[in-house]
Amino acid sequence: MADPVICFIAYPANPPALSEMLEKSIARINTEGDGLVIARGWKELGVTGKLIIREVCAAIDDCQLFICDLTYLNPNVLFELGYAIAHDKRVWITLDITYEDSKQNYDKFSILRGVGYAGYKNSDHLVNLFFQQRPYDNTRETIYSQLINSSNSTREQRNGLLYLKSRIETQPSIDLSRLIRNSGIQTITDDPDENNSQPLAWYVQNTKNSEAAIIHLLDENRDARNPQNGKYSFVAGLAMGFNNSVLMLAHSKYYSPIDYSDLLYVHETSDECVFKASKWLEALEGHILMEGKKLKEQMRGVETKIALRNLYLGEDIAENEEYDLVDYFIETASFKDALNVSQSMIYIGRKGSGKTANLYKIAHTLGGDHRNHVCLIKPVGYELEGVLRLLQVKLSRAEQ
């Protein structure tokens, strides 16, 4: 007889009725499983006197099947789901559809769009679904393997940092973005203002290919209307699962979920946010330098093989490819006009029309001439009006 499949079941402590129902389901699965399955929940881990996050992650490491209940988009459960996906675990998601908003909230949770769930009404219904669908029979059919196998690109585009911006551009968010931009660390930025519907494959690929992640959360009051913190908790779990360095920052007042309380720093002011991030980035720069040296040593003597399946298709946002865009940029009439213009030229166009791509290629081309000194000025949104006002002020030639 084959060894039983180990299942770890993640669920929230509240509301108590939901927690109780799931614990009864765990007991019934163990009783009726005929030795095929051993299921246990987080309350059985025995975390007294231990770091909870280590015990939870160890339990996920040891299981073959990860079951999570997303009736409520609980940040602890979402963090654990991200960790399980990164560790290539078979996932079975459940939803108590008797809760009025459960299905609607799940459908609106864009990062899991396309990932199915088992909808149940009570403990009997859930246990019956478990033995009917038999998720323990195909533990190798994982979300991670399906995403990686269906990816358009198998080239590992290594990045130093994945940065998940705050949904609202608060002063701490503006100052943190400036700090990261000035650090010189190659960064992939997930900006909700640019694109708030990146697919799960994008997050898995970019988290896997980054050394670290900075995740900036809103306080509960400002996140309530358009929830973003749940998705960010999930991505933090992905980053943890890929063994990345993770810094989570949150605007005050923010109640820290137990799972990632050790990764989180709640800031009252912008200065506190920037100070914490700057210290963390200093350590990250040293780590990236060391990893770069290791990679060069590994690559010595290795012949580069070019294959069509390794073709890198690039990012849909030019800001994420400042360093690589110049390698595949196709010159356009607008680009050539900008190089030949006598004094100045203004690009006008909607998002995605190529304004930033042209800017980077123009700067790179002009910078290749040692007679030129190129300076890119990219004001954040709130500074733009000030720049326009400055242009209207009469200044002496020296001041100009």
Stretches with model-predicted labels:
Residues E297-Y382, V387-L390:
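Walker A/P-loop-proximal flanking segment of P-loop NTPase domains
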Residues M1-K305:
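Conserved catalytic or regulatory cores that recognize and/or transform ribose-phosphate-containing ligands
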Residues Q392-Q400:
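Conserved nucleotide-sensing/catalytic segment adjacent to the nucleotide-binding pocket
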